[in-house]
Amino acid sequence: MSFKIVVDSCCDLTADMMKEGCFVKVPLVIRSNGSTFVDDETLDQQDLLNCMSQSEDAPSTSCPSPQSYLDAYQGVDDVYVVTLSAHLSGSHNCAEQARLLMEEDHPEVNVQVFNSCSAAAGEVAVALKILELAKSGLPFKHVVRETQQFIGRIKTLFVLETLENLRKNGRLTKLQAVITGALKIKLFMGGTPEGEICKLGQALTMKQALGKLVDKIASDPDHEGRVATICQCNCPERAQQLKANIEKKCKFADIIIVPAGGITTVYANDGGVVVSY
C-alpha cells in the first residue's frame, strides 16, 4: 500500500528527512510588521526575526486552507496527517475538514489526522514514528493505533530566550510579562497532555533554565530508550551543548537536532529551544 505523511509547517523536518519522499509539508503563513512570510523553503528566518523584533505588535499566523490539505492528500492509498496542537492553531481543524471532503470524493483512501498535542520537535517525533511504522508494512489501522498511543506518551519542554512574542499576543499575564521582562527571568515551560502551554519553573539565566530542563528529563524514568528531538531557533551551539548535557544525565537511544522553521520561530523566538521525547 502506498502512503504519505502530510505535516503542517510547524513540523520542523530537516532537508534530509524530507528526502524520504513520503513527506508533504503544507505551509502556514506569517505576518509581521507589514511583511508576509510563507512558511516553506523560501522563508528567510533572519528576515522574520528582524521583522518581529522591530514590530510593536505580535506576529500573526494563518493556517493552511482545507483545499491546501486536500491537494496534499491525493495520489496514495494511506494518508497520515500530523498537525500542530489544536489548542494552538486552526491547522488541525482545516486538516479534518479536508479529510471529510476526501472521504466524499475518494472513500477508498484512508486518511487519519493526528492532533500532535504539541508543536515543533513534538510534531517531528510523531512524523518520524509514523514513518517507522508505515515503512515496516503494518496495516493502516495498526499504524494509527500505535501512533495515537505514542502521542499520548510524548513530553514537550522548552526554554525561551525572550518572552516578547508571548507578551505581545497575550499568552503571558501583564504582571508576569512585566516581572520577567524587568528581571530577565527565563521561564522553563512545557506542554500539557492536551497540548496547552504551562509554566514548569523559572531561572535567572538561560544556563540555569536549561539545567532545570535536563534535570526534569533525567527524573522521568519514561525517557529511557526513547529518541529525543531538540528544535533550536537560531542557536545551533546552544542546542549542541544541551544535547551534550542531556547525554551526560539521561539514557536516550538517540538525540536529534532540527532547526526551527517559520512557525516555530514565531513561538520560540530567537534563541529558544524545544525538546520532545
Predicted features and spans:
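Conserved phosphate-coordination/catalytic loops
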Residues: 60-67, 204-208
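Mixed-charge interfacial surface used for oligomerization/domain docking
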Residues: 10-24, 28-29, 88-91, 95-100, ...
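N-terminal/domain-start segments enriched in small and hydrophobic, helix-friendly residues
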Residues: 10, 48-56, 63-69, 74-77, ...
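Short beta-strand/turn micro-motifs composed of small residues
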Residues: 7, 83, 232
